[in-house]
């Protein structure tokens, strides 16, 4: 079968037999490699290469927006099995913009046959050996993988797009020139990656089934750049998402809620859990000191601590209140009311919130509508997410013990119920933190009473966020995953991915953390940063507070911070009050290493841009 060539701004050469591809422009070349070719994975886990297709046709095609190649594949067969799958693969060059679209269209398939389709295969920047090569990945805040990195790296949590290892649906590679790959059909997609020592990283999208079939068109958009770095990639993604999803800035969110305006420049302070109660099956259960499995900090005790912080000079704060429910932190969700009786109950909780308001502070409740505890009063397994094979998510890691996953289709009514009960008791927190929703991967449910696609899961999570906002509260959740940013005011954390790497035993000291997320979304959401060295999610030798300054964020403080942390917190929150509504327009490393960095914030004319030059460690 002959090769197909098409395109003018970008010249594409496709081999329909192998699906090898080459892109050429006036400034660079990008190509797949013969050792990585397309395939799909069936529901039993068997990997079936596209070469197993007994039916294959290819045509060149022209349309109003550009030129394309279409390859039709069917009749897939292995020694064990025949497959009903028939697909159309289309590669189109948009002549106006020079973008390249890779589109997968299912034409025929059987339910429950295909788990993932892995196409297109990885692309690499060709030539340009004089320049050092990098791959940019939106792992939490962002990460660069140098081509010459001596460490091996592969997925350690989940490869699903819009979860911790890929919070934004894109990646990019560059030397002098480079490319950005935008996963437009992000709801049912994974980003597979593998870096071997001293080699360019291999990244590719995997299109996952939705409710048992591929079901709909999947699109990957590739943009090519003559000069490229991580800032160029982030800004190109920002421009794309602004055009398709829009960017809701903090200024717009503050118009909808005066409490968001008060949140700007406020330190985020974690209270100790009002009640920490741990079930014996939990991995947090303390076998050597059983008394630590049931510890109380009364509402009045926390109120006294708040007054001490005010006396020490903390002028603006948002208190994240853990363990306020009847059995404390991560227990009995979603049936957490009434407020913890052992800590003083509803009356004492009202006093605590009144104290926070009197001191000029904001309050927010740590809440949860995903982890569904078997000990919850209203627990019914029929309300839990049911997987494709009929099984349930099962976990007993957290203090509340055994749990399932509450189907997100049902979550909004639990929120309405719980906050109505709190209002009836005179308890009106300024905000609510809905745990897990913006951090864990999108989920499906196969229970016919509340079937849910991953896209519907994202929509229902956003409905929960907007329900909190409609009550006049600050909306908060865990991480900065793409579907949710426009619906959130505050993240609990969005640092670098080191904390999860440490837990997983991944040792990659030669990766380079970069603020990809902040370059896209800085003026759209408030992000707190831990202060000290070895802070949560910061590089081993770096000061977390300095990364906070670089990113123009706010402080994450413990309930009894030292004086140095308080001083740094005041500096950081003052900076945040200056740059909170300004796009982060640039980031660079100063000198030969990575310890000295500079970010740049745009400001409205006639004022001049602000530079934050930061040395991370000495």
Model regions and ranges:
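Short C-terminal domain-edge/linker segments immediately following a structured domain
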Residues: 132-139, 148-150, 349-352, 395-398, ...
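Carbohydrate-recognition beta-sandwich/jelly-roll modules
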Residues: 2-319, 324, 341-343, 355, ...
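Active-site-proximal substrate-binding groove within the catalytic cores of carbohydrate-active enzymes
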Residues: 14-17, 21-25, 177, 189, ...
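Generic detector of solvent-exposed, compositionally biased contiguous segments
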Residues: 1-8, 41-57, 394-396, 510-520, ...
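Short, surface-exposed, charged/polar-biased interaction segments
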Residues: 125, 135-140, 258, 323, ...
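Aromatic-lined carbohydrate-binding/catalytic grooves of carbohydrate-active enzymes
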Residues: 265-420, 424-432, 438-450
């Amino acid at each position: 079968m002959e090769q197909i060539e098409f395109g003018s701004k970008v010249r594409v050469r496709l081999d329909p037999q192998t699906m090898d591809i080459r892109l050429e422009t006036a400034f660079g070349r990008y190509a797949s490699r013969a050792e990585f070719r397309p395939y799909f994975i069936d529901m039993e886990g068997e990997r079936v290469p596209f070469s197993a297709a007994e039916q294959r046709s290819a045509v060149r095609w022209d349309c109003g927006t550009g030129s394309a190649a279409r390859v039709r594949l069917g009749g897939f067969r292995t020694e064990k099995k025949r497959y009903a799958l028939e697909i159309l693969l289309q590669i189109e060059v948009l002549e106006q913009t020079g973008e390249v679209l890779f589109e997968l269209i299912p034409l025929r398939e059987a339910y429950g046959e295909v788990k993932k389709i892995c196409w297109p295969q990885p692309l690499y920047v060709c030539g340009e050996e004089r320049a050092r090569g990098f791959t940019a990945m939106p792992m939490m805040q962002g990460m660069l993988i140098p081509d010459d990195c001596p460490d091996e790296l592969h997925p350690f949590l989940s490869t699903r797009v819009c979860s911790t290892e890929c919070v934004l649906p894109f990646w990019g590679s560059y030397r002098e020139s480079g490319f950005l790959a935008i996963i437009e059909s992000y709801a049912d997609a994974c980003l597979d990656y593998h870096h071997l020592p001293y080699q360019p990283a291999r990244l590719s999208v995997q299109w996952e089934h939705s409710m048992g079939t591929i079901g709909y068109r999947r699109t990957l958009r590739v943009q090519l750049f003559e000069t490229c770095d991580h800032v160029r990639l982030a800004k190109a993604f920002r421009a794309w998402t602004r055009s398709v999803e829009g960017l809701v800035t903090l200024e717009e969110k503050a118009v909808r809620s005066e409490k968001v305006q008060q949140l700007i420049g406020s330190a985020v302070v974690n209270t100790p859990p009002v009640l920490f109660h741990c079930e014996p099956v939990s991995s947090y259960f303390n076998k050597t000191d059983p008394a630590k499995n049931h510890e109380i900090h009364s509402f009045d005790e926390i109120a006294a601590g708040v007054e001490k912080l005010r006396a020490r000079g903390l002028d603006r704060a948002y208190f994240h209140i853990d363990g306020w429910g009847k059995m404390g932190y991560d227990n009995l969700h979603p049936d957490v009311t009434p407020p913890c009786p052992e800590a003083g109950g509803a009356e004492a909780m009202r006093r605590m919130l009144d104290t926070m308001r009197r001191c000029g502070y904001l309050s927010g409740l740590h809440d949860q509508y995903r982890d569904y505890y078997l000990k919850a009063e209203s627990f019914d397994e029929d309300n839990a997410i049911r997987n494709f094979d009929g099984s349930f998510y099962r976990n007993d890691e957290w203090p509340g013990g055994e749990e399932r996953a509450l189907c997100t289709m049902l979550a909004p009514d639990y929120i309405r119920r719980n906050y109505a009960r709190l209002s009836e008791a005179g308890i009106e927190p300024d905000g609510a933190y809905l745990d897990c929703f913006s951090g864990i991967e999108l989920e499906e449910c196969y229970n016919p009473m509340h079937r849910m696609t991953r896209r519907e899961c994202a929509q229902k999570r956003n409905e929960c966020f907007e329900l909190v906002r409609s009550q006049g509260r600050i909306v908060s959740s865990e991480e900065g995953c793409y579907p949710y940013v426009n619906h959130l005011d505050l993240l609990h954390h969005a640092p670098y991915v080191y904390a999860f790497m440490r837990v997983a035993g991944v040792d990659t000291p030669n990766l380079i953390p970069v603020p990809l997320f902040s370059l896209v979304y800085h003026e759209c959401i408030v992000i707190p940063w831990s202060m000290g060295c070895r802070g949560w999610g910061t590089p081993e030798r770096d000061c977390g507070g300095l990364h906070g300054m670089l990113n123009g964020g706010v402080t994450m403080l413990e309930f009894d911070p030292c004086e140095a942390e308080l001083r740094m917190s005041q500096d950081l929150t003052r900076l945040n009050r200056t740059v909170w509504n300004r796009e982060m327009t640039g980031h660079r490393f100063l000198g030969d290493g990575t310890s000295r960095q500079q970010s740049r914030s745009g400001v409205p004319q006639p004022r001049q841009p602000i530079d934050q030059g930061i040395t991370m460690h000495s």
